[in-house]
Amino acid sequence: MEDKIQSDDFTSHKNPTLPQVIEELKELWAMVLPITAMNCLVYVRAVVSVLFLGRLGSLELAGGALSIGFTNITGYSVMVGLASGLEPVCSQAYGSKNWDLLTLSLHRMVVILLMASLPISLLWINLGPIMLFMGQNPEITATAAEYCLYALPDLLTNTLLQPLRVYLRSQRVTKPMMWCTLAAVAFHVPLNYWLVMVKHWGVPGVAIASVVTNLIMVVLLVGYVWVSGMLQKRVSGDGDGGSTTMVAVVAQSSSVMELVGGLGPLMRVAVPSCLGICLEWWWYEIVIVMGGYLENPKLAVAATGILIQTTSLMYTVPMALAGCVSARVGNELGAGRPYKARLAANVALACAFVVGALNVAWTVILKERWAGLFTGYEPLKVLVASVMPIVGLCELGNCPQTTGCGILRGTGRPAVGAHVNLGSFYFVGTPVAVGLAFWLKIGFSGLWFGLLSAQAACVVSILYAVLARTDWEGEAVKAMRLTSLEMRKVGQDEESSLLLLDDEKLGDVL
């Protein structure tokens, strides 16, 4: 009977019905909406920091903006990228009910991020000499270096915050993350006001407020995991008859040799994930730099700043879709349901195209009004409005390609996304942007046509990799190898957790 049930699981949803599609839609958006809200709150926190920097003066705003850009490129993008390497491991471990691997992977990622924070901190400490070497204004550089120095503790908070987010999302725990983020961001505004306007700490006050806000998020998330008993429930078998005590598992999981011994395999997943995210993230910063070489650099850089803020806001939905579909795909593969994983991927891609189309619509219809929200300076307003439809078209490609990258991470293939981003953004987008903006003298819009070409190449490549090059049954076998065959014996026989796949596929793994 057990063989029959697991065989049915393996082939379930092979030909999905409409009710199954609707069920998947509900399950996906039950995760996506809280994560989108959380992303929007994080976006609001960043805007609040910039607003308080602006209250201090133009020098402080310029220095803070320079430092924020530098920390994003050298620090936060790396932290987020490495932490995303947890997605296939944790989601597939959760799907296969390998609670030990789930928790141990979280510990390993914290160690990896702690190691990564050391060279990053050296870069942040030496921001001043680096910027002066690159020819930046000394006054702006001094302000940026001051902000960066006081933001250093945020590296430590992110070594816990980023892995915790992936760890919880992989287990479909999304609403608590939203509420914890809301509580932390609610403190962000009064904290900035108190440090900047009352205590007159200036730029350091803005940096410290951001650090404290992230620290509050970490404390709340750790508190939730502890109070909810999630960790104890997971490692004790979650009511499935596991006889392992929490003490025994924690004792084994804390083994230094065991912890360090698994860093290599996790790094092999984390590094490509990091490259895939960073390559795209960094390209937007390159656009800002290229804007500084146009005929009217001040106008171009100002317009670029507004447009990147706009794309960051629009990115909150596809980023949530990517993270949640990664968890859904990983969960189903880990549970031995490859066709349900395929359904989750297809439903998420369909949603991504709808979101992209909505972005095209509003950027065309509301382009003048949106530009007017940021500036009353007519030349800047006209420039931003003229490029808004191009940005909308970019999102038509960005939404499905970001979601597709999430699917690839869920299947444990982040290297494919990294290769696609490298080729699309740097071997397609950059030459097109430079050629149109500088050689053909199209100017500012040429840079964004470069982004459009990059997104077009990226979405075609990602969709091909997901829709045409994914062997879902094979990915289920790989998920079994990743989770079941790596499970340590903790009070039960390893073989009891192996998925009962067909003999040929199981034989290939064993």
UniProtKB/Swiss-Prot annotation:
Expressed in the vascular tissue of all organs. Disulfide bonds: none annotated. GO terms for molecular function: antiporter activity; xenobiotic transmembrane transporter activity. The chain crosses the membrane at residues 32-52, 61-81, 110-130, 143-163, 178-198, 206-226, 274-294, 305-325, 346-366, 373-393, 417-439, 446-468. The keyword Signal does not apply. InterPro entries: MATE_euk (IPR045069), MATE_fam (IPR002528). GO terms for biological process: xenobiotic detoxification by transmembrane export across the plasma membrane. Keywords: Membrane, Peroxisome, Transmembrane, Transmembrane helix, Transport. It is found in: Peroxisome membrane. It comes from the Eukaryota. GO terms for cellular component: Golgi apparatus; peroxisomal membrane; trans-Golgi network. The keyword Transmembrane helix applies. It is a multi-pass membrane protein. May function as a multidrug and toxin extrusion transporter in the export of IAA-conjugates from the cytoplasm into peroxisomes. Belongs to the multi antimicrobial extrusion (MATE) (TC 2.A.66.1) family. PANTHER family: MULTIDRUG RESISTANCE PROTEIN. This is Protein DETOXIFICATION 54. It comes from Arabidopsis thaliana. The gene is DTX54.
